[in-house]
Structures are given as C-alpha cells and as structure tokens.
Amino acid sequence: MAKSENSTTSTFSSFANKIQPSNDAESDPDSYALEKFKLYETRARFYLVGSDRNKRFFRVLKIDRSEPSELNISEDPVVYSPQEIKSLLQRIAEGNRATGGLAFVAKVYGIAGCAKFMESYYLVLVTKRRQIGCICGHAIYAIDESQMISVPHATIQSDVANSKTELRYKKLLSSVDLTKDFFYSYTYPIMQSLQKNVLSSGEEGMPYDNIFVWNSYLTQPIRSRCNNTIWTLALVHGHFKQIRLSIYGRDFSVTLVSRRSRHFAGTRYLKRGVNDRGRVANDVETEQLVLDDEAGSCKGKMSSVVQMRGSIPLFWSQEASRFSPKPDIFLQRYDPTYESTKMHFEDLVNRYGNPIIVLNLIKTVEKRPREMVLRREFANAVGYLNSIFREENHLKFIHWDFHKFAKSKSANVLAVLGAVASEALDLTGLYFSGKPKIVKKKASQLSHANTAREPSLRDLRAYSAELSRGESANDILSALANREKEMKLTQQKKDEGTNSSAPRYQSGVLRTNCIDCLDRTNVAQYAYGLAALGRQLHAMGLSDTPKIDPDSSIAAALMDMYQSMGDALAQQYGGSAAHNTVFPERQGKWKATTQSREFLKSIKRYYSNTYTDGEKQDAINLFLGYFQPQEGKPALWELDSDYYLHVSGIGDDIFPDIGVQSIAKPMSGIGVNLAPVPAFRDDFSRKKLTSFDKLIEQTCSSIKNVRLCSETDQRPGGNTGSTGVAPDAAEIQLKSPNWLFGSRKPEESSSATKSGADDSEKGVTSTERVNDFCNLDWLSKSDRHQGDIFQRYLSITSTNEANGWYGGTLLGDQDENSEIYRHYAQFCQCPAMEPFENDHEFEQNFAEVLRMNTIDVMDIEEEETEMESDFNEYTQIGSDLGIIPMQCKHFASDPCWLARWLVGDDKVPKVI
C-alpha cells in the first residue's frame, strides 16, 4: 500500500543509522535503500523510478525538462508497491500519448551528480556496476559504465547548449573516468573508517560533507531539493581491494581501502605541499580491515587500523620541464610561524586524535640539494610547532633516509620499517571490536599514549636520531634487537593484566611521506600494514603471536595488495605505476626485467607530467567544483594558474567539514549492529541467475589458504628474498650449460653445501636469520658469493643426510662411501632400473629426444627480444614527442644495446 512521505523520510534516516542491512523487507518495510532505478522520459519530464534490492518498494523522482537553464525536481511522497508502480507508469504513458508517450531510457544504479556549465543541466548516471567486496554484510560496488544525459528537451535548448565552450566543458567533465578507482556503497559509509562508523550515531544518511566524498559538489543540487540522499551515490576515489583467506580452516577477509581527499587534489607537479587552509596534496587515508566471518556465530569479530600519507606541509613546488626529468624544488613562501603547517596537523588531530607520528623518508645528503632543502625546513617546522603545542599534542618526528640505507648491500629495508611500525602501533593502538556483547566502554580506554608508553617514546626519539645520523646497518638493527627484547617483556606483563576480549580503539595515526608520497611511502605503508596485521590476527584469536613471518604466504598476499594499491595511487597522482624495487626483489623477480619495467614507468610518468597533467587538473577542478563556469568570465582553460581556486575563502569554503570528527572520541549510542554477517546467511541468501564470473568472486573457491610462517620445506617455489637470489633468476642461470657443467671450484662448492648443512643441523631457518638483527654476515656473504648461486640454490632445496632420505636430493657430488649413496646405488643395480639393457635402438631414440630437449640459450634470446620490444616502445614515444636525448643517439645504430647492457655483453651477440 502507499505510504506518506513524512514517515518514509524519517524511517530512511533510522535505517541509515542502523547500518545493518535488512534481510526481510516485507517484515520491515521501513528499512530499505534505493539500489535499482529505471529512467523514463516524456517530452515534459524525466521519471526516475527507484526500488529497493528486492523490488518490493518503489519511489518516483520527477525532473522537469521544460526549462532550458533551471533544475526543477519533485519527489513523489508515495511509496509504491510493484502493482501500483506499474499502474502509475501506464497512466503516465496514456496521458502523454499525444506528445510521444512514455519511453524507457536506461537502467540506472544511481545518480553520480548533476552538472551545469553555461546553460543546460546534465545528469551523470551510473548505468553498470560490479560488486568488488563486502564489509560487514554491506556490498561495495565499482562503476563499469556511466552516462551523461542532458536534462532539457532538445526542442527548447538554445544555441548556447551546442556552443564550443559548452561542448568542451562537457568533454572535460567526461574525461574524469568514473570506471577507474571510484567505489561506493548504498548502506555502508565507506568514506569513513570502521571505528568511526561504529562510534557514530545520530547521523542522517550518508555523510556527503566528508572530505573523501568526491562528488559532494555534483550531488548537492539533488540532495538539497530532495532533503535526502536516497537518489544519489557517495563516490570515494582511491583504491579498494579485498581478499578472502583461510588459516587452518578459519576463514576471514582482509580489506584494503584507500581514500583520496578532495581538498587540494590534483596531479604531481601541479599540486605540491600545503595551501592556506592547511590542506596538503596527495592526502590519502589507508585503512586495513580484518573481518572474521566464522560460520554459526551470530556476530564475528572485526578489526581495523588507519594510516595516511600526504605531501610535506610546506609551501614548495616543482615545475614540470621537457628538458629535466627531475625539476628543482623551490620553497615558494617563507612562513616564520608555520601557520598552514600548524593547521594541517591540527586537522589530523581532529580526524585521528593524538599522537601524530611523522615518518619522513626523504634524502639527507645530495650532491645537488633538492630533497635535503625540504628536509631541513620540515624539521624546523616540527621543532617550532612542538615548542608551542602542549606536551600531549607534540608531534613524533622520525626521519630516515630511505635511499641511503637501501643502497647498502646488507640493507633490510622492511626489517627497519617494521620496527618503526611496531613502535607506532604501540603509541596509537588499533581498533578491535572485542566480544559483541561488550559495548560499554568509556573514553578513558582511548588514552594509549600516557605514562606507560613514555619509555617507548623516548626510544623512538633516540632511534630517530640514530637514523638521521646515518648509522651503519648492523648498529641500527642491533639497537632494534635490544629494544625489541625489552618491549617483549613489557608487553607480556601488560597482556597478563589486560582483558583481551575488551574493545580497543585507535587514537592517533602514522603519517608517512617522501617527495611524491608514492614509491618509498608505499613500501613503508606495507611494513606498517604487515606489523598491524599480526596484531589484528592475534587480537581476533587467529594467531598465537602478534608477529607475522615476512616470508610467509600471508605476508606475500598482503604485499600483493599493497603493491596494487601503490600502483593505483601512483597512476592517479603521478601518471604511471609506482616505482618499486623492494617488492619485486622480495617476490623473486629477475632484476634485469625489473629494471626495464622501471625504465618504462619513468618514461610514462615523464610524458604524463609534461603533456597531459594540465588537462587532467582542469577536469579535477571542474568535477570537484573548485571552478564554476560563469557567463562573461574567463574559461577554465584560459587561466594561467589555478592557485586562486584553492586559496583560503574560495575553494574549500564550498565544503564545510561538519562530518569530519575525531574517530578517537566515542559518542553515545554505539552502533553495535555493525558486525560481520554470519557465513550461513551468505550461503543461503537468494541470488539471481547470473554469469559465472560474477558468482565466482563470492564463492568459497576464491578463498586462499595461507600460513603465518614461512614454509622452507616447499622451496624453491616459495619466497627466497632472504637468500640473496631470486627464484626466476636462479632458474634462468641453472638452465644454462655454464652453470651445470661450468668451471666451479670444488672447494667452493663443498663449502657452500657445507654451510647450508650446518644451518640445517643447528635448526636455523631463513626466517630466524632475517630476524637476527645482530648478525648480518649471512647477508653480506650472499652478496659476495654471487658465483655460487647454484650451490646456494641446492642448499635450500636439499635436506640433511642425517635426517633421512625422503625429500633429499641425491646428486653426483655425494660421497660414494656414504650410507645414502650405497643405498641409492643398490636400487640402481636392479634390472628394472636398466630400461636400455637389451634394446640399443630404443636407447638411441631416447638419447636423440634428450638432445632435442636440451636447454640452451633460448631463454637469453627471448630476453633479448623482450628488451628490444621495450626499447622500441621507448623510441616510439620519444620520436612522437621529439624528445629523444642526445646521448641516446647511438641506440639507433645498435638496437640491442639496451638488452646487451641489461643481460650482459658476453651473453648477447652484437649486431654487425
């Protein structure tokens, strides 16, 4: 039956506060959200018919098409049933038969925005979607297709609607590709962290004023006229990735959500530093969620941790140049009181609470000062702010020269960053739901950084000083090991008196930055995520220890997620995928292939920053509403700079930050209904007949079994990051005859094998060697003995003779007097082991087949072909742009030069 508008509007707000999705709309008719729409048109109006997921309740939105430059929207106050909406559409068709009747336009999944340029209004509609994840039973969607439709009828539009200026604005707005890295949810506030959603109450609808809602400006005309948010979608820009894992049969999901701020948003060289409102460029919040969907339970456990990245909060810039891939860095303005920097950190305290930990990864020493200029000024700014802040608001500043440490042979970047991450997590904590019944928790629980953690804070400051002085790797990691032992004892005592089932909350955040906040920052955020994941699994009872082996399969799965996130964020801000050498080395990829790919990324990023970022920045300013076209004013593309669009009092005032509140302050009425949906509800939910590709993402076949520790017995297929040689590099070298029958010294081979056997006898695993900060000799040895790759490869895959024969690799260099060799030789003397004893013809045929399948240098030839293809692509880009460097002219005379340099001069025949 039909229902009045007043009750419907209030009940939708109630539903939004509940957050828990309704499973039976018939028993709870007031709890619904509009998820599916159909757009119809007549000559005078658009009719947007929206329904809930189960198509039991329908609403109608009427959009007038008779005004060329006005937007007149009226919402029908009636809630219709399926029969009633069908009857209504028939009556509309009958009433408009004289003017063409009622025509179906498109199937729609929501309104992404409503834009006006010079005259006409346009509707931006989502016409195709796909589900990319699920948080606490709430579906998360990405956009596959979108469509822009003109609101006024073509017969009443003036010539302005078809002018060049109007068409160019329309094309510019359409260049913002909603199908890339935009996501939304109908029922879950994905723009807020899990902790914020749990602690929030009393909010009506989706918080469109949140800084991470990118279409806040575009949806404002519809939201203001309807006084609700049921017709529009709150789009978040960034990255979303979710995987389902299983540890010994216990299923859970790990979700990575990156949210890009719409304030001071833009491209790499056009948006740097901070603006007058304290907004920084490339401001991205990253949340890591772990949800335990254990079957049979009413409510599972959940945990999340938040970190963020952002440009250095100073007034600095770089100008893109066609002649310099690394432009000089300029400090545009000297602010003696660092007012904008102060506003930025106050905003972080408002968003995340205290403490704010700043991890600065830029260089300290350079031949030509670039990054070090910012490093000194940033340190001065933090020092000044700490002198005027109260002690509880002091910034924790850590500076570490990432590049300087990574260049050393014995560098273990992830180990150092992991130690810093552990310190940061001790100070900020993380969110854990605890037992579902325990919901009464006072705000005093949130004061994590009090007297009990002051020793850790002092160690953190001392550690920052050590890193800034550039201590050796052994000294730094030795200090980390000693402090880690002390932390373990303190943590054990703390855990004995702590109720592990009680809810925990995060207060404070780790803020990481380099110059671009892309490449180095992503490695540091992965190290933080890995340390946090161990604590999350431990809190949820999925692990016995709060640490995860860096060589484990679950660490590899998490690394893939952060690598995917880093590539997406780098593409948005920098124009290419992220530069990275740590992840490929850890994943065992061949160094030469990695170098060629990094080279192409540099070319692509250079091209994007030099030639396409200007138009991309204009599209962002138009989409976010920082520029609003007006008659008689200069067009967007005629402006010399967009600086005035983002200064105080113009751009940011469009979006008041009412919805941005500290996640560290609990409110009354905690949203206890926000919890994972039990697995049995997913198993028996009704699903329509659809394609296999869509269903496979939600079935159990997508669950990946992982381990919390490394599986050394299953190598070489596993990770070999601690051995000093990549698996695919070892495979290529082992296939070469020089490695199988080359001139390796017997004493070197025996010593290498013996060293591997000694480790096996002592029970020392590769993981323990990585965690042994005090002894890095094994790292330096692996670098010095590059010629013994074959023997070190065998030492990994072989077992000790004293441990038995199963799984052992018996080769020709074994001692003939050993018990195992005699046992093996005895089996070889059996008649069944001599297949060619009486058949010489079969023996010759078999030998010929072996010769045909002999592995030769074909792999090197394939690598040469791949390198030539990469270089040809680079040459094509350079020739199209006319920017081929002078020093690259000799490439044209020898196309194989790049491949020869990467693979080796002695392995590639020169082209004569």
Swiss-Prot record:
GO terms for cellular component: Golgi apparatus; vacuolar membrane. InterPro entries: Fig4-like, SAC_dom. Its EC number is 3.1.3.64. Its cofactor is Mg(2+). Component of the PI(3,5)P2 regulatory complex at least composed of ATG18, SAC/FIG4, FAB1 and VAC14. Phosphoinositide phosphatase which catalyzes the hydrolysis of phosphatidylinositol-3,5-bisphosphate (PtdIns(3,5)P2). Can also catalyze the hydrolysis of phosphatidylinositol 3-phosphate (PtdIns(3)P) and phosphatidylinositol 4-phosphate (PtdIns(4)P). Required for normal cell morphogenesis, cell wall synthesis, and actin organization. This is Phosphatidylinositol-3-phosphatase SAC1. The gene is SAC1.
